[in-house]
A protein has these predicted regions:
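C-terminal-of-GTPase-core extension/linker across diverse P-loop GTPases
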Residues: 42-50, 54, 183-305, 322-324, ...
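Generic enzyme active-site microenvironment
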Residues: 313, 347, 373-376
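Inter-motif core of Ras-like GTPase G domains
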Residues: 329-350
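Switch I (G2) and immediately adjacent beta-strands of P-loop GTPase domains
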Residues: 95-104, 110-112, 295-322
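Glycine-rich, N-terminal phosphate-binding loop of Rossmann-like dinucleotide-binding domains
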Residues: 129-131, 316, 348-351
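A glycine-rich (often HGG/GG-containing) alpha/beta subdomain
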Residues: 27-187, 191, 195, 371
Length: 499
C-alpha cells in the first residue's frame, strides 16, 4: 500500500525485490536498482559540467551527458570534419573551435561516446580546451544556454549507476580513486571498481537466497518432511557465511589504514627532537624548532608516503609535568593522539641518560606498535637499545640525528617494513575501506549469527527466514540492490560536480 514498504523474495528471483513506497515502484533486475521516476527524468535531460579541477591548467574538460548531448555539442563546437556529432566516429578526437555566434572562445578537441558504451551509459560528448577558468566558464555557460542543465554533485556517476554501468560499490570506488592518498589505497579502490567487492557481496547474497528458497519450501510443504535435512544444510551453510563475513570484518581496520593512512603519533619529552624529526621526514621546515622546551603546544598533522602507504604524522606537545595551562592542553591532546594512533614514534634524547619522563613514555609503549628513536646521536650517546628493551620490550630502535639527517634512511627502512605489508596485501586481498560497507557487513553478520542460533535451538523455519532475508537485504545495500532513494541521494551528494 502507498506509504508502506513491502518486501518479498520470489522463489524464481526473476524480480528479486519489490518496494511500494510513497507511490514509487522500484525493482531489481540484475545488479542495479532502478528508480523509475528518476530514470524518466534523466531520459529527458542532458547535463553539463566542468569535469576538471578548479584553477589554471594545460587542459580543461566540459562534459555533456544525455539524450541531447550531440545536438548541444553541435551548437557550441564546430569542426570541418563532420556536420554533426551523430555522424562522428565514436571515441575519435575531432579538432575544432568553441564558438558563441561570431565569437571564438577557444580551440580544442571533442570526442563523442555513443550510448550505451560510455561512462554514464548515455550519449556523452567531452570537449577539451585550454585550462583557462574563464574559457571553461564561458563554454559551460554556452552549453547551458544551448539546452543543457547544470549537473548536480556526482550526477554523471549516479546516471552510470541508474543505467546499470556501475553498481553502488563500484560508484563509491570512483570517489575512492579520486581521493586515494597512496598507492595501496589506489590499488584497493581499483579492485573495488573492477567488481571484487561486488562479486563477494553477490556471492553471499546468492548463498542466502538459496537458503531462503529451501526453507520456504519446508514452510509451504510441511507434509514432505524435509525440515530436518534442510536445517542441517542451513546450519553448515550459515557457518560458512559466518566465517566469510567475519574474516572480512577482521580486515576492516587494515582497510581503514589503506584508505586513510597510518595514524602516526610522534611523542617524547620536550626538546627530544620531535619537531626536528617531523621536518626530517617531510624534508621541509614544517614545525618550529627552538631550544626552548614546550615550543610545540598544539598537534601538527602532515602526511608522508612510505612504500605506497600514507603516514599521517602527528607532531605532539612534549610530555612533562607543567603548570602552564596552555601547555597542559597541548599535552592532553598529545596523549589523546597517542591513544588513537596506529603507530607511535617515541623520540628519546639519546645524548642524556633516561630520566623518569622518558621511562614513563617507554612503559606506555608496551603492547603498542611503536618505533623508538634515539635522537641526537651526533652527540655523545648515553642510551643504548638494551636500555630501551628493558623497559618497553623488544621494539625497533633506531639511532639518528634528526638535525643533520644521519640515520634517517634506517628509520625509513623500519617504516617501510610496517607499511609494505599493507601495500602488498592491497593488491591481492579484499579489504573493506568504506565505513558504510563495514557497518552493513557487521549488521548482516549479526543477522546470520541470530539465524545460526535459531537453527541450533530448533526454532521454526519462519524465524530463520526473517533473519536471512534481513541479512540478504543488508548485503544488497552495499551494491545498491536494496537501497532506498534517500540513501542513494546522500551517497552521490558527496561526489564533486563533474564526476
Amino acid at each position: 500500500s502507498s506509504g508502506r514498504k513491502c518486501f518479498s523474495v520470489s522463489p524464481h528471483y526473476s524480480v528479486s525485490i519489490v518496494f511500494d513506497a510513497e507511490g514509487d515502484v522500484w525493482y531489481n533486475g540484475k545488479n542495479t536498482l532502478y528508480f523509475m521516476k528518476e530514470q524518466s527524468m534523466y531520459e529527458e535531460t542532458t547535463i553539463a559540467a566542468i569535469a576538471t579541477a578548479p584553477g589554471e591548467g594545460g587542459i580543461g574538460i566540459i562534459r555533456l551527458s544525455g539524450v541531447s548531448a550531440a545536438e548541444i555539442a553541435d551548437k557550441i563546437f564546430h569542426t570541418g570534419k563532420i556536420k554533426t556529432f551523430k555522424e562522428a566516429v565514436p571515441y575519435m578526437m575531432y579538432f575544432g573551435h568553441v564558438t558563441d555566434g561570431e565569437k571564438r572562445i577557444d580551440e580544442g578537441l571533442a570526442v563523442y561516446m555513443k550510448a550505451p558504451h560510455s561512462y554514464t551509459g548515455e550519449d556523452v560528448v567531452e570537449i577539451q580546451i585550454h585550462g583557462s577558468a574563464e574559457a571553461l566558464r564561458e563554454t559551460l555557460a554556452l552549453a547551458l544556454r544551448s539546452g543543457a542543465v547544470p549537473a548536480m554533485r556526482g550526477e554523471f556517476t549516479k546516471r552510470a549507476f541508474l543505467n546499470g554501468r556501475l553498481d553502488l560499490a563500484q560508484a563509491e570506488a570512483v570517489m575512492d580513486i579520486i581521493s586515494a592518498k597512496g598507492e595501496a589505497a589506489l590499488t584497493q579502490a581499483e579492485s573495488h571498481l573492477s567488481g571484487a567487492l561486488s562479486g563477494f557481496v553477490h556471492g553471499v547474497m546468492e548463498e542466502l537466497k538459496d537458503l531462503i528458497t529451501k526453507l520456504e519450501v519446508t514452510i509451504d510443504y510441511p507434509e514432505e518432511d524435509l525440515e530436518d535435512l534442510t536445517m542441517e544444510e542451513t546450519g553448515d551453510a550459515l557457518e560458512k557465511i559466518d566465517k566469510s563475513l567475519s574474516a572480512l570484518l577482521k580486515r576492516s581496520e587494515e582497510g581503514r589504514v589503506i584508505r586513510e593512512g597510518l595514524r602516526t603519533a610522534i611523542i617524547g619529552r620536550p626538546n627530544a627532537g620531535k619537531s626536528s624529526l617531523l621536518n626530517a621526514l617531510l624534508q621541509e621546515e614544517r614545525a618550529i624548532v627552538t631550544d626552548v622546551p614546550g615550543t610545540t603546544r598544539d598537534t601538527i598533522e602532515e602526511a608522508v608516503r612510505i612504500s605506497g602507504v600514507s603516514l599521517l604524522l602527528m607532531d605532539t606537545a612534549g610530555l612533562r609535568e607543567t603548570d602552564n595551562k596552555v601547555e597542559q592542553i597541548g599535552i592532553e591532546r598529545a596523549r589523546a593522539s597517542m591513544e588513537k594512533a596506529d603507530l607511535i614514534l617515541a623520540v628519546i634524547d639519546g645524548s642524556s641518560p633516561l630520566d623518569e619522563e622518558d621511562k614513563e613514555i617507554l612503559h606506555s609503549l608496551v603492547g603498542k606498535k611503536a618505533i623508538v628513536i634515539l635522537n641526537k646521536y651526533d652527540l655523545t650517546p648515553e642510551v643504548k637499545a638494551e636500555d630501551i628493551w628493558e623497559i618497553a620490550g623488544h621494539v625497533p630502535v633506531v639511532s639518528l640525528s634528526a638535525r643533520y639527517g644521519s640515520g634517517m634512511d634506517e628509520l625509513r627502512e623500519e617504516l617501510r617494513k610496517i607499511t609494505e605489508k599493507q601495500d602488498t596485501d592491497a593488491g591481492r586481498i579484499l579489504f573493506l575501506t568504506n565505513l558504510r560497507h563495514v557497518e552493513l557487513v557487521r549488521k548482516a553478520l549479526d543477522n546470520v549469527l541470530r539465524a545460526r542460533a535459531s537453527v541450533r535451538e530448533g526454532l521454526q523455519a519462519d524465524f530463520i527466514v526473517i533473519d536471512l532475508t534481513e541479512a540478504w537485504k543488508t548485503m544488497g545495500e552495499i551494491t545498491g540492490d536494496t537501497m532506498d532513494d534517500e540513501l542513494i541521494h546522500s551517497i552521490f551528494s558527496r561526489f564533486c560536480v563533474g564526476k
